[in-house]
Amino acid sequence: MHKGLKRLGVITSLGVLLVLIQGALVTNTGSGEGCGQTWPLCFGQVIPLDPPPETVIEFSHRLVAGIVGMLVILMAIWSWRRLKHMPETRFLAVISVFMIIFQGLLGAGAVVFGQSDLIMALHFGFSALSFASVVLLTRLAFEDSNPQKQYAPIVSKAYKGYVIFVAIYSYVAIYTGAYVKHTNATLACSGFPLCNGQWVPDVFTEAIGVQLLHRSAAILLSLLLLVLFIWTVKTFRASRVLVVCASLAMLLVIGQAASGVAVVLTYNATLTLGIFHALLISLLFTLLCYMVMLVTRHKAK
């Protein structure tokens, strides 16, 4: 059942993930102006001739994003028609299309007109939302093929509210990380946990303040997820899905923290670390969104 839709969902999910990674690559390599101030053309050409590396990175990002955008729209329409009996479908379909289009327009606007760092930091956040919505649509297709796997754990109002809060807060943490990248504040603090050898550095220096804000947001997210893990294991041990999700969330945030510290300690010398850092937080956010979907299916006690 839904064999074609499931295949499209998997391909589209991987495609959006690739676009997300390419976007991180563009940011980490400073290739945002690799095609000049022209869009959708690249230096006025449909296909750039003899392009330098930054042009290849930017152009390939645009090309893949365009193809994946069409897949997302197809996925949303197909899901709307075949999975309309599932309450989450229409919301996820609308969000997936809106986010993929909006992030494309935001990227195009940044190339042609330029944008502030505050606005550009939203670009990665929209990518994360797009990825999460497509993955959840795909999950719905798999669930509908096997009704026995349509999980709807019964949880308390407090737990439900906490899961929603952590998911929303994780998006805030994503934004602070993206803002660090767009303000070139990655290395504003050398060393960890100290900042330039100080416990209390000058937070009024913009780059240092931005870096410390992200560190604080990341530490708080780790603590929130630790509470979620303990709460889930102690109270909802019978719900294997929630326990697995909470456990994976802890593993992802540990990897996220480790990769972030490694970026600082290696002076951002390894491109792979920065991309891995972006990948892990996107997977974590998607996992938390899945938990939100699960805990909101039943009316909480």
UniProtKB/Swiss-Prot annotation:
Listed cofactors: heme b
Compartment list: Cell membrane
Binding annotation for heme b: H214, H277
Topological type in the membrane: Multi-pass membrane protein
Catalytic residues, chain numbering: E58
One GO MF term attached to the UniProt entry: oxidoreductase activity, acting on NAD(P)H, heme protein as acceptor
Disulfide-linked positions: C35-C42, C189-C195
Membrane-spanning residues: 8-28, 57-77, 93-113, 118-138, 160-180, 216-236, 241-261, 275-295
Pfam families in alphabetical order: COX15-CtaA (PF02628)
Any GO BP: heme A biosynthetic process
Superkingdom of this protein's organism: Bacteria
UniProt record similarity statement: Belongs to the COX15/CtaA family. Type 1 subfamily.
Self-association and partners: Interacts with CtaB.
Domain comment (free text): The N-half (TM1-TM4) and C-half (TM5-TM8) domains are connected by an intracellular loop. Each domain is formed from four-helix bundles and they align in a pseudo twofold symmetry manner. The N-half domain is the substrate-heme O binding domain and the C-half domain is the cofactor heme B binding domain. The cysteines of disulfide bond Cys-35 and Cys-42 may be involved in transfer of reducing equivalents from quinol in the membrane to the active site of the enzyme.
Protein name per the record: Heme A synthase
Gene label: ctaA
